[in-house]
Amino acid sequence: MALRVVTRALGSLSLTPRIAAVPGPSLLPAAQVTNNVLLQLPSASMLLPSRPLLTSVALSAKFVSWKSRTKYTTMPVKMRKSGGRNHTGRIQVHGIGGGHKQRYRMIDFLRFRPEQESKPGPFEEKVIVVRYDPCRSADIALVAGGNRKRWIIATENMKAGDTILNSDHIGRMAVAAREGDAHPLGALPVGTLINNVESEPGRGAQYIRAAGTCGVLLRKVNGTAIIQLPSKRQMQVLETCTATVGRVSNVDHNKRVIGKAGRNRWLGKRPNSGRWHRKGGWAGRKIRPLPPMKSYVKLPSAAAQN
């Protein structure tokens, strides 16, 4: 131990001789000349580490985010991870960071999107392949119809070679619901299992998109449809909103075993704080009433009716 201390002390000593100040032809006093020479030639021990000046340098203007793309493509698009931070660099979502590099595949959540040159009305598409998507929990399917291809969320039993129907027609009688088809809620029979539900007509699916989830069409009231979400909460939308029949694919997603902490880092999940936290009022079982029904239907007010 003593030998190690002596070795470190000898290593810290500088073996280079100190630079002597040579007085030259100057009108300044000798002491000030010596100080100027020492300031011009600092020793290596006086150089302290400094922070870079360009800490807020702007990103490259050539990089185009996948969110700003206006032309649809089925090819994987390069994606830059945010690490849970916004454009100012502040953390907005904790627990995000790292992970394997991923490429984004643009999903078309608007199932009834006829081509410009096609006839108006229902149209069919054929499933080409069903594959894994690293950016979401559910599997995705590549479908083709007419002169285009697009990615959609796959249902539970969807496989290559299947034919799916996309319709916007609401008839007097309910249609025969077939898994993978997309119909307005007003055309489906009550009790149908649905997924990828729109909140507004033509906006695209926003609800029930995670792996293995499904909702239930409870009832139809005055041109609206009441849906039960996977959280048991009810939602009211117009009957012209489109939904897909069936259950979302990858049903066993919640049964997977991570196995080790490193796999969570592969998936881009950062560890939480190891500090002990006291459990608050959220912990434990309790009798809690269901939240009120969420409605996307703009009902006329009482003042407008009068």
From Swiss-Prot:
SMART domains tied to this protein: Ribosomal_L2, Ribosomal_L2_C
Taxonomy, superkingdom: Eukaryota
Keywords on record: Mitochondrion, Ribonucleoprotein, Ribosomal protein, Transit peptide
Entry-linked InterPro entries: NA-bd_OB-fold, Rib_uL2_dom2, Ribosomal_uL2, Ribosomal_uL2_C, Ribosomal_uL2_RNA-bd_dom, Translation_prot_SH3-like_sf
Main subcellular location: mitochondrion
Keyword Nucleotide-binding belongs to the record: no
Entry keyword annotation includes Ribonucleoprotein: yes
GO MF, one annotated term: RNA binding
UniProt-listed Gene3D superfamilies: 2.30.30.30, Nucleic acid-binding proteins (2.40.50.140)
Protein location: Mitochondrion
GO BP terms, alphabetized: mitochondrial translation
Location of the transit peptide in the chain: 1-60
Coiled coil: none
Subunit structure: Component of the mitochondrial ribosome large subunit (39S) which comprises a 16S rRNA and about 50 distinct proteins.
Record family assignment: Belongs to the universal ribosomal protein uL2 family.
Official protein name in the record: Large ribosomal subunit protein uL2m
Designated gene of the protein: MRPL2
